[in-house]
Amino acid sequence: KQYGSLYWIYPVKALGRSRLILMWPNTTDGAIPVTDPVNHYYQDSVLASEVWRKLGSMIVARMEEPLKEFVAGGKAYDDGEAYEKLGNEYDKDEKAWKEENPDADDEDEEEVNRRPYVIKYKNAVAELCRNGGYITGGSSRSFEGDFSEWLRLLVMESYENIKKDYLDNSKPRALKYEILIKYFKEYGWDIQAAGNKYRTEFNKYKASLPSED
């Protein structure tokens, strides 16, 4: 029912290479209540994403060494140096912008996303990911983070969407994709087929929800 201390609870926690602990009911931020236990995996994408990231870390812990071809397919990991530099620049730009716009409303998400310093930051992170072959900016920290994000993406997203959003605009990502697909097939797992199914089932679930209008 609960793992962690009074002040720091872990809704999903990997213990070493072989144990994965899930609080149930799960309290991961954004997770949904269980209404259909059989199909909950295909409905709660937030919880599923978190679980696959943890499983990715557990898989890496079992490897004797990182996948050399995969690592060589993108830029070298830098322990987050480049990503954190972008974050520091964002903080400076945000501070300067707010000094010029003291009455700005941070509660208006659409307006916040149109601010120049936000657009600049998002574009810079996107470029970091395209050039390095990463899925997220944080993936540039280490092989573990990079592999985990790729695993989560492949097992939960369709090839059509992955190609459009990640492969067509980045040769390093396209190369890493092919390497991982081959890697998992050597273990008898067509991971992209799993991702295609997840996207199909998740879309069915979303379509079944009442309209918000």
For the regions a language model picked out, list residue spans one by one.
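Active-site-flanking segments in enzyme catalytic domains
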Residues: 2-213
